[in-house]
Amino acid sequence: MFLDDVLRLTRSGPAKASMSANKWLTLWREKKEMLAETPAKMNAVSSLASTFRDADRTLLFTQSILSANTLASSLTDMGISASAHHSDLSTDERDVIMSSFAAGSTTVLASVQTLEEGVDVPDADLAVIVASSKQRRQMIQRMGRVMRRKADGRDARFIILFVKNTDEDPRLGAHELFVEELLAVARESSIFETSQASEVRAFLDPRRL
């Protein structure tokens, strides 16, 4: 995988190649954070507040700690019980947050790569990919957090936010296999602009089906 090769060069490549790899990695991380923290995505998440209130539990997946903290804080200000879950928190702090999510006291969890394989996550019926991972395995794990069969027969709902004409745009081939697997099990799917918040909320309303 290309990213693995870059990381290998930063650790053990020739001096010139290692320098170039480190420069590329810095720019890549900056771009990843910019896509995660773009105000348009923050506004898109805020516009779904009523959908989060109606959901049992919601998982927000992003790629920067600032994004997770901003999302949790913004939703909390809107009266939604939301928490961020990331590596800057201690293990004890993350355990308390997860227990609150399991009990239903916290209904929205914004995560940065801390809910991946090996972490027991309570059942959720809504997930939002605010910023996507380039690792297909990680994306499939995220899908699995929500796509488990619900005891009461409810449909799981899955949202992917993306900036058009960037390398996270599924229409340009981003996460092609992951999106194909998602669509293969979807009852319905659609693409909306951020200006269509009311249409998105109506589409996600479980009472519509």
Predicted regions located by residue number:
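Interdomain linker/hinge connecting the two RecA-like lobes of the SF2 helicase core
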Residues: 1-57, 71-73
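Short beta-strand/turn micro-motifs composed of small residues
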Residues: 10-11, 62, 86, 131, ...
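Conserved nucleotide-binding/hydrolysis micro-motifs of P-loop NTPases
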Residues: 66, 90, 115-116, 132-135, ...
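Long, largely alpha-helical accessory region at the distal end of helicase-like NTP-driven motors
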Residues: 170, 174-177, 184-209
